[in-house]
Design a protein with these regions (language model features):
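Short, conserved SAM-binding/catalytic segment
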Residues: 1-4
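A conserved structural/catalytic subdomain of Rossmann-like adenosyl-cofactor enzymes
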Residues: 15, 19-260
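Short, well-structured beta-strand/strand-turn elements
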Residues: 6-9, 134
């Protein structure tokens, strides 16, 4: 990329002052506290315990890279850095840093982040800083045949400074509705082979379409109507996105005090 398309490549976990100059100058970035320039972040970050981040220069940029201790109202950050942190955890905070107040993020994360007992402090931090708009549990074959990790997509909205101050004053986190769904069909199996929808008898469903084509007949070009049949990929992700849009409309009408 020559930069004209505003696409840049850098180690996004490194300190922002080390990012490529044409990028940092374009949006006036100086440090990790000065990167909230974006309205939307969509990401599928690398994850796994085999690629931990252990550079203290990188870790010290992130609140969730520190050790957190259980407290009366949740968890409290200490001044002690963890020895290493999986990259997906750091990417949650980095993406949040990149957002403006009220900005939205869609991020793919391993399910351990949502349920592992040792990561309660992380879930506490997430709920303190964002409104969870949706949690969508993906099928285990979603990234097969390359990766079988069980993952979810989280849709998040960055809370404003005012929102967080109000919650801190009451020592509570506001309750709000969250869209939840499970994707049971993703259009392929664990080997990567396409899967198709079937009827109650097990026959593959098809869509019949008529179209006009041109062909040569007796030295002349004539138009002819033909019927084509196309199998329907068994993928629920598009359907769930449409259901989510309808859900959002309903929530805006019912809960005007929340930003969906």
């Amino acid at each position: 990329n020559d930069g004209s398309g505003s696409v840049f490549q850098s180690n996004s976990l490194a300190n922002p002052h080390t990012w490529r100059e044409e990028f940092t100058k374009k949006i006036n970035i100086n440090n990790s506290k000065d990167i909230g320039k974006f309205d939307v972040v969509v990401t599928n970050p690398p994850f796994g315990t085999k690629i931990p981040i252990d550079d203290p220069v990188i870790l010290e940029q992130f609140e969730i890279a520190y050790i957190w201790e259980k407290s009366e109202n949740g968890f409290t950050k200490t001044t002690r850095l963890q020895k290493s942190v999986p990259p997906e955890i750091l990417f949650i905070e980095r993406c949040l840093q990149l957002l403006r107040e009220g900005g939205r993020m869609a991020i793919v994360l391993p399910d351990a982040i949502l349920g592992a007992p040792g990561l309660k402090y992380l879930r506490y931090w997430i709920l303190k800083n964002v409104q969870v708009l949706a949690s969508i549990d993906l099928h285990k074959d979603t990234f097969q045949p390359k990766n079988g990790t069980q993952t979810s997509v989280l849709l998040l909205r960055k809370k404003t400074k005012k929102e967080k101050e109000m919650e801190d004053a009451k020592s509570t986190i506001r309750k709000y509705p969250t869209f939840m769904a499970m994707v049971e069909h993703v259009g392929h199996d664990k080997r990567g082979n396409l899967t198709f929808k079937r009827d109650e008898k097990g026959n593959e469903k098809v869509i019949s379409q008529k179209e006009m084509v041109k062909e040569e007949s007796k030295g002349k070009i004539v138009e002819k109507e033909i019927e084509t049949k196309t199998k329907i990929t068994d993928d629920e992700t598009t359907e769930i996105s449409l259901i989510f849009k309808e859900w959002k409309k309903e929530q805006k009408e019912r809960y005007s005090e929340y930003d969906f």
